[in-house]
A protein has these predicted regions:
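Active-site and substrate-binding clefts of carbohydrate-active enzymes
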Residues: 35-65, 70-291
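Acidic-and-aromatic substrate-binding clefts and catalytic sites of carbohydrate-active enzymes
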Residues: 1-4, 25-34, 111-112, 145-146
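Contiguous, well-ordered alpha-helical segments that form the cores/surfaces of helical PPI scaffolds
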Residues: 4-5, 231
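Acidic, His- and aromatic-enriched active-site or binding-groove loops in soluble protein domains
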Residues: 7-49
Length: 291
């Protein structure tokens, strides 16, 4: 997922590149009134000026074919299809210039669904690309090293590489309830940090100054409690807990994911010297499995 706010943070942290879905590029160009030529779908872009990270937008169809379809195909037949698509793309591009087709798999591990953990497919993939006269494989860093051109975005429409939006993580009443629990716990946590003098000022790449926890400040209780509290809050904020709420991603482990999420909220509060909110002790009902 990316947004203009996230890209500012990435620039501050000096990330060289990030990646997301081509749908985010299409929405961003529409938002900014830009109409890129088809060739510009196969190059990185930048938003935010010099020093901002390059953004690569994956080819959704081909990436999902590798991630979700080709495990059911003979590796040779699958690569025949993939090479055919890549050759078609290449014929539609100018002769001169550096272009690439980003193949970025979904977050799940695709290879466990392939026979032999994907070894036969990967050998076919790298062998066929290496032997092809007009195609070669590359990392994103290598592509940038070769000096390929970057498109400049005037706006970035916030979105993920799943449908180019955030509906997987928000919108359902149970997902909303999870966000409410997180927001309340985060507000309590930040108030405790402010009261304890545990916030420092951090300047972002665009010049804005924002508060951030200072891990060198000793929290309440044992030395290191504040660092552990920060880690617990980060665990609650940083994973796909909301993916599993609602009815769009069924799982038999809904109760376990819910317990883990609320456990991180309670741990963060306790380690920061707070009494965990009582509502974090009650399960969030889960449509996709046991509740």
């Amino acid at each position: 997922s990316i947004s203009e706010t996230a890209l500012r943070v990435f620039q501050t942290e000096e990330l060289r590149w990030v990646a997301t879905d081509q749908g985010v590029l299409e929405h961003s160009c529409a938002l900014g009134g830009q109409d890129p030529a088809p060739a510009r779908h196969f190059q990185p872009w930048r938003w935010g000026g010099e020093g901002a990270p390059a953004v690569f937008f994956r080819d959704t169809g081909l990436s999902d074919a590798v991630g979700f379809r080709y495990q059911e195909r003979d590796p040779v037949a699958a690569m025949d299809e993939l090479i055919g698509h890549l050759e078609t793309i290449r014929r539609g591009l100018p002769e001169e210039g550096e272009f690439l087709v980003p193949l970025i798999l979904d977050g799940e591990n695709a290879w466990e669904a392939y026979p032999g953990s994907g070894e036969a497919f990967l050998r076919e993939f790298y062998g066929r690309i290496a032997a092809h006269p007009n195609l070669h494989w590359s990392t994103f860093s290598d592509h940038l090293d070769r000096g390929g051109s970057l498109g400049m975005l005037t706006h970035v429409r916030a979105g993920s590489w799943i449908r180019a939006d955030f509906t997987t993580w928000m919108g359902h009443p149970q997902k909303t309830r999870g966000w409410e629990l997180l927001a309340a716990a985060r507000d309590d946590f930040q108030a405790a940090l402010e009261a304890g003098g545990a916030l420092r000022k951090v300047t972002l790449a665009d010049g804005r100054t924002v508060p951030a926890p200072d891990p060198d400040v000793v929290g309440p209780g044992r030395p290191g409690d504040l660092a552990r509290a920060m880690a617990a809050m980060a665990d609650a904020e940083s994973s796909d807990w909301f993916w599993w709420y609602g009815d769009d991603n069924p799982t038999e482990y809904g109760r376990e994911f819910d317990d883990l999420f609320r456990g991180h909220l309670r741990n963060a509060a306790a380690l920061a010297g707070l009494t965990p909110r009582p509502e974090t002790a009650s399960p969030v009902p889960h449509d996709g499995g046991r509740s």
